[in-house]
Amino acid sequence: MGGYILGGGHSPLSSLYGLAADQVLSAEVVTPDGRFVTADFTQNTDLFWALRGGGGSTFGVVTSITVKAHPDLPVTASTFSFTVGGNNGSITSENFWTAVRNYLDYFPSLSSQGIYAYWFIIPTATGPMFLMQPFWAPGKTLEETNALLAPWFAQLTALNITFTPKTVHYDSFYPGWLASFPLEAVEKTHVATGSRLFPKENWESPESLNATFEAIKTSSQANLTIIAFIIDPSLKNGGYPDNSANPAWRNTYAHVLQSINWAQGASAAVQLQARQNFTFGFMQRWRDVSQGAGSYLGESDILEPDFQQSFYGTFYDRLLKIKKQLDPKDVFFAQTAVGSESWKVVTANGLPSGDGRLCRV
């Protein structure tokens, strides 16, 4: 849980309660000089601020964290999918993408209701598949959840897209989460992933939302996998925390990832070319339509240019100052962590990796 909380941390309750970092009340830490300290709102306050969102492997070894406890609540979850070529070939590519574009229109209203939607666009043999797994409605009844989905479902029906949603109400959070969310795999060695926190301004005009949609569509049509969330961990939802979580989190309706893969066992040259195309091609398109926004460092591209702005935003200068004060000898290091620009990892094959020699820049 350390890296999850220290890096910000999003969850199925983020549109209600904010980020994981927003829940922290105190932390016990071993500092780089070997002291065991408590950091909270009254002592070691700079360290406490930095730990809540400024990234792991940077400021100390966190041995324990005290967090807020929220009351259990009921939840309704819905899962469904539709695929180009489905319904005996009746779902056309044009209608599929119209459906996805329509879906984006609902992000502001859904997030205002505390919704956290976990959705995918996955390449298949017949064309892309849209998968919702799940549409997560904490505190909502079955009827309320169906009402939230009804406008978009009506549009899907009008587009001749048939689907069979499985919508289930649970009296408690944990059984709902256990039944609704997929088993996650660790990152694979033949996959590169990057993310973008698309800003709320992108929903302020049809032109900007269309540009966002086209950037996502372009990646999907190149057979990249899209993994995304409706999410709104705003300052209001997080209880107006004063912490170091990326400010881009406070101004988004959508955390969207894309991933590219190459053949297992591919040469270093092939892998490097794929990564370059991904970082400076597909990811650059996303940056171009969300200038000044950011990326979630916990689900990010290791080659992200200007990672200081993307992962930490306007908080980077303060974080770097705290890093230099607490860890002047750079006892702690992680790639793309605060202060890591003073170092580089030199690998034998030139691939970006933490497996190599750590050298001063």
Name each model feature, range by range:
Residues 1-361:
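Soluble FAD-dependent oxygen oxidases
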